[in-house]
């Protein structure tokens, strides 16, 4: 007998969390159930062609309890899923939206725990601001843990969350020809998201890093040579790469199928977001990936003193960019929050992490993965092993129904 399930995402939920929620919703729909998905208007594009009913919730936030309880009654919902539990609590609790009604609902409430909160750090560290994770967000018994990011052995609720390759012929040769790449050229793909734009940051230190980090990357990676091209997939062209001339190409935001084709045409993914869904796509595509992170904090003088061999270029850049804060998700932070999640996690073996300020390691790691076939093959082998381990896990619908 089919059932109706309600999914609730906070309006500020990122594309990654909503995309993971949609993966579960589509699996339930494929097995005959119905899903009503409440989410912000900004993510409506994700629902196109999915067959999942999306209802914008932006105008209902301050009457959420009444709205949700009435909807559950009207639609006779069998369950409520929070997409994801962290964004629901961190977005709604600070603005005074009461969430204690969730504990009193007569139906199961399931927490999509995108970050595996019981393993993560206790604070949502945003550089200078580090609000604690609300205890109720950690308390849900019914949790769905997508892999990645959770460890495959994290316990009940884990499910395979790697994207699947669509049934399409290989596109590498055709796309590389379209991009004007020669046989000796190497293509680095750099995806960015709207939430990373400088003008959308709420804190000055985030906006400064959103502007300045691409400047440092462009200057440092120029050392890779004329054979290396960069393809930027994102909402807005970056002026930081102007010195690359025609070797920098801006693609804009693209549909998932096009992104998959571009990744298959690329030789390296360069990311500043450790947990980006584009990184998951790279694992599926067998695309070597470098993730840039920063574990250092301090003023320009403090950071230079800690690196006696700092180049003149790094010193000049720090004069504009510092003070820095640690990050695993640029420009926000979350270094302390995510570090425990990545410890002893096989997901962390599917990419090479490099420090923002270690210019030699950044250049040489990228150079090896672009030009040394054995280095690229070794990383692909780790991706292959991880893929097989994830594929052995329960699917999203199976994990979901395990909590009903």
Task: Annotate each predicted stretch with a short phrase.
Residues 277-381:
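Catalytic binding pocket for nucleotide-activated donors in carbohydrate/polymer assembly enzymes
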Residues 122, 126-197:
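A nucleotide-sugar donor-handling region in carbohydrate enzymes
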Residues 65-67, 172, 233-285, 290, ...:
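Donor nucleotide-activated moiety binding/catalytic core segment of transferases
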């Amino acid at each position: 007998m089919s059932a109706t399930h309600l999914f609730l995402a906070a309006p500020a939920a990122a594309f990654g969390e909503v995309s993971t929620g949609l993966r579960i919703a589509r699996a339930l729909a494929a097995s005959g159930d119905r899903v009503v998905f409440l989410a912000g208007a900004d993510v409506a594009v994700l629902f196109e062609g999915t067959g999942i009913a999306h209802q914008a919730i932006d105008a209902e936030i301050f009457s959420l309890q009444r709205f949700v309880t009435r909807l559950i009654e009207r639609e006779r919902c069998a369950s409520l899923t929070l997409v994801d539990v962290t964004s629901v609590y961190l977005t709604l609790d600070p603005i005074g939206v009461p969430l204690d009604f969730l504990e009193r609902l007569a139906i199961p409430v399931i927490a999509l725990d995108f970050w595996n909160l019981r393993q993560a750090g206790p604070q949502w560290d945003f550089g200078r601001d580090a609000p604690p994770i609300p205890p109720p967000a950690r308390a849900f018994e019914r949790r769905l843990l997508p892999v990645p990011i959770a460890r495959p052995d994290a316990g009940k609720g884990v499910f395979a969350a790697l994207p699947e390759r669509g049934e399409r012929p290989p596109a590498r040769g055709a796309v590389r020809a379209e991009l004007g790449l020669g046989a000796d050229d190497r293509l680095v793909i750099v995806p960015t998201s709207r939430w990373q734009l400088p003008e959308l940051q709420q804190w000055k230190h985030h906006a400064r890093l959103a502007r300045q980090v691409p400047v440092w990357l462009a200057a440092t990676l120029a050392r890779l040579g004329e054979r290396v091209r960069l393809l930027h997939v994102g909402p807005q062209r970056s002026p930081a790469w102007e010195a690359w001339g025609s070797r920098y190409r801006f693609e804009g935001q693209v549909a998932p199928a096009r992104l998959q084709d571009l990744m298959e045409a690329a030789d390296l993914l360069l990311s500043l977001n450790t947990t980006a869904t584009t990184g998951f796509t790279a694992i599926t595509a067998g695309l070597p990936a470098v993730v840039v992170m920063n574990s250092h904090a301090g003023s320009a003088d403090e950071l230079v003193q800690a690196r006696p061999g700092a180049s003149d270029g790094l010193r000049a850049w720090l004069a504009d960019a510092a003070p820095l804060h640690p990050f695993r998700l640029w420009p926000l932070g979350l270094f302390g929050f995510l570090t425990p999640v990545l410890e002893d996690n096989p997901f962390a073996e599917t990419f090479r992490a490099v420090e923002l300020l270690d210019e030699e390691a950044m250049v040489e790691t990228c150079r090896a993965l672009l030009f040394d076939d054995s280095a690229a093959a070794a990383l692909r082998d780790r991706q292959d092993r991880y893929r097989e381990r994830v594929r052995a896990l329960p699917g999203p619908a199976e994990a979901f129904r395990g909590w009903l």
